[in-house]
Regions:
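Plant-biased, solvent-exposed loop and capping regions
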Residues: 1-790
Length: 790
């Protein structure tokens, strides 16, 4: 528990103090007291997380007996030198994690003078390119065992300095730096190395065959680089426990030598370009394996239905791995402690056995999406953890929607064949439910007014079903951020209670039967709204000026309604549309949980949810999801808007699409329309615009300057023009089809008659003989006459 107050000089009375731990001290933002340097008997000093500012006092160099120093997680902003460290000859443990050392230029020199140093932790310090020091500065202790330089800006120039510790280094962490080029073969000289982490860099080339001592290396993490080639034969690394190679460009197949890695606990080779067949032989001796991720490759799994694995997995991720047989993997029933199971997009076209629904109650994540799994879901696996997710989308499940586990957080049943009435939604009681997606099913009936059962529901997607009736007022009692009800049969008006959903960012009720005017409370009470889609309803009336208060709005679709009146000039208040920058992620609709907490690298798993919106783009309706944050558009088409196009709309320079077609707009196109230089789609057709003599280009008759004419202009009068038009109207695709059919009918009609009817065939060949004889006689006579004449 942190404590507060000030560090008083009364500490000086403790002249024999050897151990001082003030970590997480919540004092005022001041510098480290200089008098600490007078406690010369100190051997342990911990000032981590104390919010100290300024610089590090050089008086700390007086603590010549200090063995351990921790200054991590402070707010130093004026550290220009670390030379005080050179006066600490007994220092063995130094931690300055996430301390701002960007202005420090002598840190390497100071470190090299710590002859007793064993553990060095400088992660997140802003350290950058290192020039190899002169030999005179080389560390003389040769005892440094642990180096943690993750989250810095080191380039590959750091490698030569590391070679000073070939015989002593046990753990090296260079994750999240700027390393480039190939991994040097000299890593093979680090005979004591047990843990090597080069993840999240820009390394390329092949993985060296020699990486440390094969009899000592326990963890190897090369994930998120640009490594190519095949995974080398690791059969000699019999002591390796964790092998992480995801997010590279590795190819080739997985050699059967992996079965020799009997100590392997974690194998992650996901998101590469590997292929080949994986059979039970690959796992023959991997009895300690707990984490297996081979997803997002091109593997084919050939695992027998009767196979009994030698391991008990906690985590299994086989997404996009094709099953040699499209059956549900029966061997999964042998796994009794699995917490994360992902077999999505695996071409499984089978039903699920009853044993599957009795999985151990420790499951946190289940993903069966993107298969062809059929059958009714009697119940979902019981889940204990309060942060858990089930994704069974894009399958062939049918029947009524199954009851929910009480502690589920995310449930995605979209893209199935669930039907029945919507009344059973009231039977769901999920205190922790945050995300519910049952879109693209055949659910019907009126939505029950029982949404108070979910206290934390933030995302609700009921799109593309057959729901009817009015939108329940109790939806407004949810902390909802995204509400998708498009393409149903909802009627009535938007419930006024939705004005209480002040955190709403995504509202899509398009393609329904809603009527009434657009309520003013949308602009007044929903300031966070980013997507507003009311397309294809029965909405009428004019636009309220309060709509212009939606400064975060990026997508506004009011098309195919009966809205009238003028387009408000205040649309220029849409600040997000007036910016020419976008965000890749509109919402942070993901949740995290600790995945694989038992390994040396426990990490959090993000379970994202992508909001989908349908946008009419260049005449075609398109689906946008992952890139939705980059789209900015206004669609007012097919309404009854009148008056002029306001010039203020041209201030929305971030617009990519503007559709005002099929209205009653008049006047001229604003001269400043050219300011919309990011615009990719502009449709002003089917209006009554006038005074636009400067418009040119297809399909208008006026050609733009420098525009090439598609066909030559030939002035032969209206008669010739009509003939050419008539010819084009005759020679159509139907003309060519008729010609082909006629040729085939005539050709085979004659040939079949000659082949099948003997008298006709004999008569035909007799005719050919007579014609041939006649031609021969005529040729002989003509030649004879020609000879007489000569």
């Amino acid at each position: 528990m942190p404590f507060k107050g000030e560090i008083g000089s009364s500490l000086l009375e403790l002249q024999y103090l050897t151990y001082l731990d003030l970590s997480l001290f919540e004092g005022s933002e001041t510098s480290i007291p200089k008098f600490i340097g007078s406690l010369t008997n100190l051997r342990y000093l911990n000032f981590s997380g104390c919010n100290f500012i300024g610089t590090i006092p050089y008086q700390l160099g007086n603590l010549t007996r200090l063995v351990s120093l921790d200054l991590s997680f402070n707010n130093f902003d004026k550290v220009e030198s670390l030379m005080f460290l050179s006066h600490l000859p007994a220092l063995k443990h130094l931690e300055m994690r996430y301390t701002n050392l960007r202005q420090t230029t002598d840190w390497l020199r100071a470190i090299n003078m710590l002859h007793s140093l064993l553990n060095l932790h400088l992660s997140g310090c802003g350290l950058s390119v290192v020039i190899p020091p002169p030999l005179s500065l080389a560390n003389s202790s040769k005892s440094l065992a642990i180096i943690d330089f993750c989250v810095n800006e080191f380039s590959s120039s750091i490698f030569p300095w590391l070679l000073n510790f070939n015989n002593s280094l046990l753990s090296l962490n260079l994750e999240l730096n700027q390393l480039q080029g190939q991994i040097p073969d000299t890593f093979g000289n680090m005979i004591a190395l047990q843990h090597l982490n080069l993840a999240f860099n820009h390394l390329e080339g092949r993985i060296p065959i020699s990486l440390g001592n094969p009899f000592s290396l326990e963890t190897l993490d090369l994930s998120w680089n640009n490594l190519t080639g095949e995974v080398p034969n690791l059969s000699n690394f019999s002591f390796i426990k964790e092998l992480r190679l995801p997010m590279n460009k590795l190819n080739g197949s997985l050699t059967e030598s992996t079965d020799l890695l009997s100590n392997l606990e974690v194998m992650d080779i996901s998101s590469n370009s590997m292929n080949g067949v994986i059979s039970d032989i690959h796992f023959l001796t991997l009895s300690k394996l707990r984490h297996l991720d081979i997803s997002l490759n091109s593997f084919t799994l050939n695992l027998s239905s009767y196979w009994v694995p030698p391991f008990q997995l906690d985590i299994l991720i086989m997404s996009s791995c094709k099953q040699l047989e499209p059956h549900f993997p029966q061997w999964l029933q042998t796994q009794k402690r699995i917490i994360h199971l992902d077999i999505s997009n695996s071409r499984i076209s089978d039903g699920i056995s009853d044993w599957f629904w009795e999985l151990p109650p420790i499951l946190m994540y289940l993903n069966l999406s993107g298969n062809l799994i059929c059958g009714e879901v009697q119940k979902l696996p019981f889940i204990v953890d309060n942060f858990s997710a089930i994704d069974m989308s894009s399958n062939c499940f049918h029947g009524s929607k199954p009851p929910l586990p009480p502690n589920i957080t995310v449930l995605n049943l979209s893209g199935n064949r669930f039907s029945r009435n919507a009344s059973n939604l009231c039977s769901i009681s999920g205190e922790y439910l945050n995300n519910l997606d049952v879109s693209d099913n055949s659910l019907s009936g009126e939505l029950p007014d029982c949404w108070t059962n979910w206290k934390k529901l933030g995302i609700l997607n009921l799109a593309n079903n057959n729901f009817s009736g009015s939108i329940p007022a109790s939806l407004a009692l949810l902390p909802i951020e995204a509400l998708q009800l498009r393409n149903n049969c909802f009627s009535g008006e938007l419930p006024p209670s939705l004005s209480n959903c002040t955190g709403l960012k995504f509202l899509d009720v398009g393609e329904n039967r809603l009527f009434g005017t657009i309520p003013a409370w949308i602009g007044e009470n929903l300031p966070s709204l980013i997507v507003l889609r009311l397309r294809s309803n029965r909405i009428y009336g004019s636009l309220h000026l309060q709509l212009c208060h939606l400064t975060s709005l990026q997508i506004l679709d009011l098309s195919n309604n009966s809205i009238s009146g003028g387009i408000p000039q205040c649309l220029s208040n849409f600040t997000a549309m007036a910016s020419n920058s976008g965000t890749v992620e509109i919402f942070d609709n993901s949740y995290s949980y600790l995945l694989d907490p038992w390994t040396t690298k426990g990490w959090y798993k993000d379970v994202p949810y992508v909001n989908i919106v349908m946008i009419l783009w260049k005449g075609t309706e398109r689906e946008y999801g992952n890139t939705l944050g980059l789209v900015k558009c206004i669609d007012f088409s097919s309404n009854n808007f009148s008056g002029k196009i306001p010039g203020e709309i041209t201030r929305l320079v971030g617009l990519l699409s503007l559709n005002l077609s099929n209205n009653q707009l008049t006047g001229v196109i604003p001269h400043s329309i050219g300011h919309l230089n990011l615009l990719e789609s502009l449709d002003l057709s089917a209006n009554h615009l006038s005074g636009n003599a400067g418009l040119c280009g297809e399909p208008l008759p006026n050609r733009c300057p420098g525009e090439k004419v598609a066909r030559p202009s030939i002035n032969r009068g209206s008669e010739n023009t009509d003939k050419r038009v008539g010819k084009r109207e005759i020679i159509t695709s139907g003309f060519y089809i008729s010609m082909g059919v006629g040729f085939a009918t005539g050709f085979w009609g004659v040939c079949c008659s000659l082949l099948l009817y003997r008298p006709w065939r004999h008569a035909y060949f007799h005719f050919l003989d007579r014609v041939g004889s006649w031609l021969y006689v005529r040729a002989v006579i003509s030649i004879a006459k020609l000879q007489r004449m000569l």
